[in-house]
Amino acid sequence: MTVTIVGSQLGDEGKGGIVDLYGDDVDVVARYQGGDNAGHTVVHEGEEYKLSLVPSGAIRGKVGVLGNGCVVNPRTLFDEIDTLQERGLDPDVRIAERAHVILPFHRVLDGIEEELKSETDDEVGTTGRGIGPTYEDKAGRRGVRVGDLLDPDVLRERLEYVVPQKRAVVEDVYDLDVDELDDPDAFDVDAIFEEFREFGRRFEAEDMTVNAGAFLSATIDEGQNVMLEGAQGTIIDIDHGNYPYVTSSNPTAGGAATGTGLSPGVVGDGEVIGIVKAYLTRVGSGPLPTELGGVVGDTPGYDEQGEGENEELANYIREEGGEYGTVTGRPRRVGWLDLPMLRHSTRVSGFTGIAINHLDVLAGLDEVKVGHTYTLDGEELASMPATTEQWAKCEANFRSFDGWPEVDWADAAEEGYDALPENAKAYVEYIESELDTPAYAIGVGPGRGETIVREQPF
């Protein structure tokens, strides 16, 4: 069977920890979209592992698959694999031959485009890792796929077609001299060919490439369990998110089918677990109706740190929750939980269960609020509007909950749900009721043993 893990908010919900939590019953963990822009942290046997491309389950000795919906930077991939091996692990990672490859010029173009957007306050908040430009080339039918790295003739043909186009973009559209860039070799066919053909040789030598759909289907047919791991979150989905402040792929459950080669029926017959942070965070620009305080350069109209409402509360949550980007180190914007957002995410992906993380971060507050509904042009909305411009005009209608005290969270995790403070349980049960979806797990700390497990999906 399959279990699909979907971020229900704006990313950084703690998906990797839930993948790890249920990992003992899994044979294969497959990522179905994104690239090395999606950082996740896994704590295993007291050791912390920060990954951006290797699937979380590989830390526990499971087979990790990067599906065809992913974009793969072989530099990052092999750096992570080599680092894990140096720490005594031996990750088994397979790469879909249909997955597209992030090439050096993608990263350069990503940086140029974001810098130009920043001059007009239209920046999306990209990590600069070439994800968007790679997906653009995929849609434009000029990309290079992992399977191409295995065939030198095909690889050279692809590069000789696309690289001159990219040089022309830099020189004729952006009016820059390629030779004066920090990495002029990023636009050199021979340099790219030599480096990426070597990556192809390593893929072959280590038998890493697969036909992902066929591989995963055979795994399921053998009675094994497959976990499908999404990156980022629903609200930055290219179709269902707050466009244009989105990623370039589909983190929602629908992307699990297209990004692995499994049928929608197979994915739909399994469990779909939405991962919910007990409050809200965001990296980058765009609306955030329940925001507390702000971050200069990200929060619209926010020009001086410390000027926003509830700044002290925002800093408290940010520090208690360690709310800084895994990949970029950028401070995350923080806000109260947003129920219209979660209702939207639940509908889009059809969650059969949710996992609520970071409940402990809110402990010690006198009052905890939730954005229960929005008001837009005098009308109350229970779910997000379709356009970002409408969302930016929404005002949150809050519901208040009495806070809960700090407790020994490790003991609470061991004893189970009934050991939670009563007010914390009221908060959890409100979320379950509003989404009509049970909480399968409740995270009360960063470690695997600091999660209350109420339901095993496998």
From Swiss-Prot:
Stored CDD domains: AdSS
Location, primary (coarse class): cytoplasm
Any one biological process term the GO annotation gives: 'de novo' AMP biosynthetic process
Residues reported to bind substrate: 326-332
Required cofactor(s): Mg(2+)
Pathway it works in: Purine metabolism; AMP biosynthesis via de novo pathway; AMP from IMP: step 1/2
Residues annotated as the enzyme's active site: 12 (proton acceptor), 40 (proton donor)
Endpoints of the signal sequence: none
InterPro entries: Adenylosuccin_syn_GTP-bd, Adenylosuccin_syn_Lys_AS, Adenylosuccinate_synth_dom1, Adenylosuccinate_synth_dom2, Adenylosuccinate_synth_dom3, Adenylosuccinate_synthetase, P-loop_NTPase
GO cellular component, one term: cytoplasm
Residues reported in the UniProt entry to bind IMP: 12-15, 37-40, 127, 141, 232, 247, 330
Entry binding sites for GTP: 11-17, 39-41, 332, 358-360, 443-445
Keyword terms: Cytoplasm, GTP-binding, Ligase, Magnesium, Metal-binding, Nucleotide-binding, Purine biosynthesis
UniProt cofactor note: Binds 1 Mg(2+) ion per subunit.
PANTHER family in UniProt: ADENYLOSUCCINATE SYNTHETASE (PTHR11846:SF0)
Family under the similarity heading: Belongs to the adenylosuccinate synthetase family.
Reported function: Plays an important role in the de novo pathway of purine nucleotide biosynthesis. Catalyzes the first committed step in the biosynthesis of AMP from IMP.
Official protein name in the record: Adenylosuccinate synthetase
